[in-house]
Every structure is written in structure tokens, then in C-alpha cells.
């Protein structure tokens, strides 16, 4: 883009609303989601209470839905990385909840009040038995950043809302998984992708 507004484009609505984020390093959450015009005038901006990333969509109701980061403590799984974590004082026994896992939450904001009126968290619907064991995400240099430890567990990077099916689709990069979610119940209809220890993948695990 051009001009003094550092806008990142994600997608557009059927009504040709342009949706994305604006880069603003003065903010704690430096990529607030925005609905903007072709002239880069802001039509709507999410409240920036949480870190939004990768996708923002406008629903047929006029409300907005996006992907935000959420976290909770979880175990460090047993693996080739175990001894390295233990050297830094972690138990790293595969079951002690001692390490920050960063997951994702799908959030719907009211278009007028910007209040969260619906949400869905991976921590409520995915098993922490499932993680990327082959992509290097548990290697120590992937989880440590200037002494700030965190594990990028799910990394949801795409969101689609289907009014016809009353469903939300998400793509979860680090689990190699696509999930269909019933809206508004939040029930997982199916998971498609790599087979993992929980057995929660229903189809596509032989692709």
C-alpha cells in the first residue's frame, strides 16, 4: 500500500469491504484489525483488547469475526528437546503444567458496541495431547525469545464463515488440521488432517 498508514490486507467482504490490520508499534497489540475503504479510511476497528492475527471477516449480520491469541500453561512433552529444557530449570516430564502454550480463539464482535458476543477457544475443543512433533516448534530456540518463553501451539491462520451452513471453518497450521465448527453452538463437526494421539481427527488422515 501507499501513504502513511501501514495497512496489511487480509480479504474483502461480498460488499467489497476491505479487511485487514494496521501496523502500529505504539500499541501493546500492534496489529489491530480494521475494515477500511479503498482510500484507506477506517470504517471500523476492533477494540484491540487482544492480539488479532491472520484474518478478520465481516459477517452477514454486520458483526465482525477474527482470530486472537490466547494462552494457558501446559506441559513440555517428552522429546529430543527434553534435556535442554531441564538445563534451564523446567521439569519437562510430559505432564506438569509449567510452560505457556499460545493457542487461538475465534471472537465475534458486535458491530456497534464492539463487545465480544461469541467466542470459541482451541483450549476448550482441542486436546493438548496433539502437537507438532516433527516441525521443530518444540526446539528450544523456537520457544525462547529473549528469556520470554512460549510455545506456539496451534497457529490458526485462516477463517471462513458460512451463513448457509451456520458454520465456521478454521485452518490450524501447527496441527496440520482444518476444523468445521457449528455456529453458534461451538460444537466441532469434524477435524480433517494429520492423525494425532487424541484420535480427534475424523477424516483426511490418510492424505
Where are these regions (language model features)?
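Secretory-pathway ectodomains
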Residues: 1-207
Amino acid at each position: 500500500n501507499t501513504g502513511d498508514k501501514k495497512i496489511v490486507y487480509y480479504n474483502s467482504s461480498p460488499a467489497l469491504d476491505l479487511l485487514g490490520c494496521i501496523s502500529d508499534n505504539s500499541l501493546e497489540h500492534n496489529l489491530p484489525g480494521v475494515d477500511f475503504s479503498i482510500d484507506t479510511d477506517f470504517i471500523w476497528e476492533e477494540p484491540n483488547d487482544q492480539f488479532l492475527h491472520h484474518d478478520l471477516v465481516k459477517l452477514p449480520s454486520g458483526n465482525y469475526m477474527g482470530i486472537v491469541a490466547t494462552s494457558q500453561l501446559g506441559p513440555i512433552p517428552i522429546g529430543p528437546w527434553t534435556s535442554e529444557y531441564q538445563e534451564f530449570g523446567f521439569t519437562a516430564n510430559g505432564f506438569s503444567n509449567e510452560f505457556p502454550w499460545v493457542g487461538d480463539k475465534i471472537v465475534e464482535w458486535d458491530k456497534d458496541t464492539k463487545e465480544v458476543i461469541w467466542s470459541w477457544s482451541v483450549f476448550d475443543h482441542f486436546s493438548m495431547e496433539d502437537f507438532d512433533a516433527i516441525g521443530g516448534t518444540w526446539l528450544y530456540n523456537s520457544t525462547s525469545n529473549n528469556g520470554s518463553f512460549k510455545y506456539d501451539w496451534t497457529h490458526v491462520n485462516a477463517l471462513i464463515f458460512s451463513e448457509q451452513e451456520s458454520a465456521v471453518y478454521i485452518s490450524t497450521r501447527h496441527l496440520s488440521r482444518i476444523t468445521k465448527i457449528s455456529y453458534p453452538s461451538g460444537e466441532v463437526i469434524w477435524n480433517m488432517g494429520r492423525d494425532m494421539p487424541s484420535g480427534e481427527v475424523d477424516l483426511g488422515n490418510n492424505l
